[in-house]
């Protein structure tokens, strides 16, 4: 057998393995028994891989790889999203840098430019996903602007339109004056800002209780130009006399009424609230209830429209300053307060959003949200972790009609056509330039495009042939799982459920797996502007894809957010290092080195059944069976963090540190062949279990391994797969026969004794060759088990004498270790200077006591606790707790010498 290279280099090995997989066609859809279908959440076509993508894709690949190895019919659909506003913004910026305006070149040429941009940059993220080792079918990549996908989008719109679920209406929307398009509530980003609350005087048309004016409080004085009323709370008796009266609106001289409305908070400002129905959603509701005029004072760029004198042509910021100045000059600025408040911003360009009354297209959700709620409440769709169910149901219960129109050029154009001659209007699945009603040729299509989420809501079924080839969905829909971020439970997940139930009468997926948000090391969100983001490709270049994937999977706990351990250069914004990913790489190296050692000792090996010949074999096979069950079940239940950490604990701490150590002596004796078979059985099973987590290194090792019992057919002939990724998965049912609780208990006792001896050597810096006198006290049953392992314990612990019994006495001058109900005493007399050791320990105790007293004094200082940063206070508390634990341990050690 050819010897494995001494070192494993991810930078050269991983690309070579990737090419092997691609050349072998192993990523392609495979048919089998049972199905596992996953549709990758489509990243923006012009985007690049970020830590969220890397986490998401690592989870999905683990699911798919295990399913493929279990012989299931697997389909992992890859695709990208056209990302309407994101792509249009980038292309717009590019054209401007070339001195070109999209308005100059027109819609058709601009859309062509978007396609050019998509073709030029669209493949970057797909290549990055490929480099991660994600086993998607790259030959069947989908795009939300593909012709057949566009037909699906169009059919959905037309069906909902004709079913009365899509309508056009005037509503308050979140408007971005920079992108000049509507933005959904769920896409708006709230930012805390320092602002002001201006108190303005509005003159009464006739005095009330001796007052000539009222005072309204507002954070947006510029919108007063569009005020059409003033509201007070019905709970405020002091304002009752003003109800039914009117004020003369300054600047515009518009007489507007004062009325009562339950929307008003009597404790806000003076209790009088200006009402601007065209520029505030609450005011819009009050305006509807009280039949107030809706006056839009801004155009689509948030510039004051004609009819407002000196204010016309001002942008909203200029208008604010001018209005405040006017009120101040006319003695109507009562006073100003500083105010911290939350302001909505566009998620794409960061401009402050403008509540703006405009005509838009909407989906009426009342008929859609009920079935979507039932799907989750009945368990047809299950969230993991379960707490995200509440996020889904709360959003769905409070769902308002969905604004689906966007004032963009790049995207799915709304398929509604209008006849200018006869007023005909209809939604059509095919374009037309002739009116079917009057035969006229003055027909035009709606200028708006659909919200990106409208098209992506169809992702699980439109990517698999619907509606053209619905038979392709058979066995693959509902899909197995959707792995995604919590940020888009409302934007995407809920809408996918609504549309799938409506058009297919089934849910789009059975499980929704929400992974934690990956934060920067300091707990802040990763972002380009902060320069604290980590590029997954930098991690792969530094540590390899396996190390990155494994580290990310260990972070997939039930926590909502997790900090990623990475150090970033503040000047260059480049990755310096990632200690946790470095540790993950060490695990990859351990797997390689342990496998290489075993394969170097396989001379004369032939495949055959594993046989329990020693207590270590029985223990290892039992632990192996439990590892098979643990990995399989935890991938099935989507508890990836527990699974990943459990794999390392098993392979490193149990297989490498103990079983290989105990068994390697047998490789030199008469039992060599059976020891080889047992070791290869354990190694092969372990490598298969770790493959979904770390596919590259496991594939490379497996390629160097001889056949094991797992590769033998019913007649005992070798029938080995071409690649590990299509080899057979270790099924828990096949390993259940190896579970042996007694054998596990016996060997755990052995490990306790040996570990106590080794820990004593380490603590007191004793030579590994120094033989120790060890005394073990335990129950009779455990002593019997330990005696059966005496021949294993003595060489591993390197004992001069080993006394074991239920009633043995604690030797003088010995250190005690208690674990698993067993007391292990290691005699130190003659091995260390007891008096010097005791003096050293007492000195450490005194130092720890002194430091603890200082910590407690500081923490008792109320000024420190109140004024110091919470993190500093907590650090001091943690240190005090740590010192107490140290003192307990040191005191116990001193007692050992007494």
Positions of predicted regions on the chain:
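Feature 926 captures the class I aminoacyl-tRNA synthetase adenylation module centered on the KMSKS loop
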Residues: 199, 394-454, 458, 502-545, ...
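Conserved phosphate/anionic-ligand binding catalytic regions in large, soluble enzymes, centered on
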Residues: 48, 54, 79, 160, ...
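Residue patterns forming the tRNA-binding/recognition surfaces of aminoacyl-tRNA synthetases
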Residues: 2, 7, 16, 20-24, ...
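N-terminal catalytic cores of NTP/NDP-binding nucleotidyl/phosphoryl-transfer enzymes
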Residues: 30-91, 153, 216-219, 223, ...
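Catalytic alpha/beta core of large soluble enzyme barrels
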Residues: 60-61, 221-301, 324, 328, ...
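Secondary-structure transition/capping motifs at alpha-helix termini
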Residues: 65-73, 94-104, 127, 131-136, ...
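Non-catalytic terminal extensions that flank enzyme cores
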Residues: 1-51, 74, 347, 591
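Glycine-rich, acidic and aromatic/proline-enriched surface loops and short helix-turn segments
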Residues: 120-131, 252, 456-466, 553-554, ...
């Amino acid at each position: 057998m050819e010897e494995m290279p001494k070192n494993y280099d991810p930078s050269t090995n991983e690309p070579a393995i990737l090419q092997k997989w691609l050349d072998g066609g192993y990523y392609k859809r495979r048919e089998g028994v049972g199905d596992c279908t996953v549709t990758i959440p489509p990243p923006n076509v012009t985007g690049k891989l970020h830590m969220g993508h890397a986490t998401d894709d690592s989870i999905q690949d683990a699911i798919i790889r295990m399913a493929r190895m279990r012989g299931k019919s697997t389909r992992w659909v890859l695709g990208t999203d056209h990302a309407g506003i994101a792509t249009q913004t980038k292309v717009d910026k590019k054209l401007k840098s070339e001195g070109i305006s999209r308005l100059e070149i027109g819609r058709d040429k601009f859309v062509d430019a978007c396609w050019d941009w998509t073709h030029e940059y669209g493949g970057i993220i797909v290549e990055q996903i490929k480099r991660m080792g994600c086993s998607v079918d790259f030959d069947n990549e989908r795009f939300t602007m593909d012709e057949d996908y566009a037909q699906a989008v169009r059919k959905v719109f037309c069906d909902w339109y004709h079913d009365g679920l899509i309508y056009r209406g005037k509503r308050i929307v979140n408007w971005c004056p920079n992108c000049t398009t509507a933005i959904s509530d769920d896409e708006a980003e709230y930012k805390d800002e320092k602002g002001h609350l201006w108190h303005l005087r509005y003159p009464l048309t006739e005095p009330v209780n001796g007052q000539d004016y009222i005072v309204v409080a507002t954070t947006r004085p510029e919108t007063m130009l569009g005020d059409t009323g003033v509201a007070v709370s019905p709970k405020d008796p002091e304002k009752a006399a003003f109800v039914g009266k009117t004020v003369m609106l300054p600047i515009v001289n518009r007489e507007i009424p004062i009325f009562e409305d339950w929307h008003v908070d009597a404790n806000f400002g003076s209790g009088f609230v200006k009402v601007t129905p065209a520029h505030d959603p609450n005011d819009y509701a009050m305006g509807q209830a009280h039949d107030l005029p809706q006056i839009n004072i801004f155009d689509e760029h948030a510039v004051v429209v004609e009819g407002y004198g000196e204010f016309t042509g001002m942008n909203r910021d200029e208008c604010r300053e001018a209005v405040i100045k006017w009120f101040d000059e006319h003695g109507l600025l009562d006073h100003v307060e500083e105010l911290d408040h939350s302001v909505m911003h566009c998620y794409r360009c960061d401009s402050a959003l403008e509540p703006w009354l405009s005509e838009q297209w909407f989906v009426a959700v009342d008929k859609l949200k009920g079935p979507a709620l039932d799907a989750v409440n009945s368990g047809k769709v299950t969230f993991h972790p379960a707490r995200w169910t509440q996020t889904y149901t709360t959003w769905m219960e409070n769902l308002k009609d969905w604004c689906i129109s966007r004032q963009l050029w790049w995207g799915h154009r709304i398929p509604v056509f209008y006849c200018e001659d006869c007023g005909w209007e209809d939604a059509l699945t095919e374009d037309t330039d002739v009116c079917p009603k009057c035969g006229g040729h003055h027909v035009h299509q709606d200028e708006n495009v659909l919200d990106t989420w409208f098209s992506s809501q169809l992702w699980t079924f439109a990517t698999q042939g619907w509606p053209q080839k619905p038979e392709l969905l058979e066995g693959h829909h509902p899909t197995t799982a959707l792995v995604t971020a919590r940020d888009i439970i409302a934007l995407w997940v809920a809408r996918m459920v609504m549309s799938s139930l409506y058009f297919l009468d089934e849910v789009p997926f059975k499980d929704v797996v929400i992974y934690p948000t990956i934060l920067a090391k300091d707990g802040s969100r990763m972002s380009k502007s902060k320069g604290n983001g980590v590029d997954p490709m930098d991690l792969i270049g530094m540590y390899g894809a396996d190390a990155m994937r494994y580290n990310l999977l260990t972070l997939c706990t039930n926590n909502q957010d997790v900090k990623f351990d990475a150090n970033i250069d503040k000047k260059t914004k480049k990755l310096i290092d990632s200690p946790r990913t470095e540790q993950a790489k060490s695990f990859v190296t351990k797997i390689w080195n342990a496998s290489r050692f075993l394969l170097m000792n396989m001379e004369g090996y032939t495949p055959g059944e594993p046989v329990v010949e020693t207590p270590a074999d029985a223990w290892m096979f039992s632990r192996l069976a439990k590892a098979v069950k643990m990995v399989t079940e935890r991938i099935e239940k989507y508890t990836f963090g527990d699974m990943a950490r459990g794999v390392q604990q098993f392979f490193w701490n149990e297989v490498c540190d103990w079983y290989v150590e105990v068994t390697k002596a047998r490789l030199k004796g008469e039992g060599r062949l059976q020891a080889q078979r047992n070791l290869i059985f354990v190694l092969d099973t372990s490598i298969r279990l770790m493959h979904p987590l770390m596919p590259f290194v496991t594939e490379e090792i497996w390629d160097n391994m001889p056949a094991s019992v797992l590769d033998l057919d019913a007649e005992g002939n070798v029938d080995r797969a071409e690649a590990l990724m299509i080899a057979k998965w270790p099924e828990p049912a096949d390993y259940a026969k190896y579970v042996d609780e007694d054998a596990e208990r016996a060997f755990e006792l052995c490990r306790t004794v040996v570990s106590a001896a080794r820990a004593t050597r380490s603590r007191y810096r004793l030579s590994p060759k120094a033989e120790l006198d060890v005394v073990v006290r335990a129950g009779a049953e455990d002593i019997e088990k330990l005696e059966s392992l005496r021949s294993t314990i003595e060489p591993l612990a390197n004992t001069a004498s080993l006394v074991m019994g239920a009633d043995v006495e604690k030797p003088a001058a010995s250190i005690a270790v208690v674990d698993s109900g067993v007391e292990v005493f290691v005699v130190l007399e003659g091995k260390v200077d007891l008096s010097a050791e005791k003096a050293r320990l007492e000195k450490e105790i005194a130092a720890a006591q002194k430091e603890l007293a200082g910590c407690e004094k500081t923490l008792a200082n109320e000024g420190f606790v109140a004024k110091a940063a919470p993190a500093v206070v907590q650090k001091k508390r943690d240190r005090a707790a740590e010192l107490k634990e140290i003192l307990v341990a040191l005191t116990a050690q001193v007692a050992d010498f007494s």
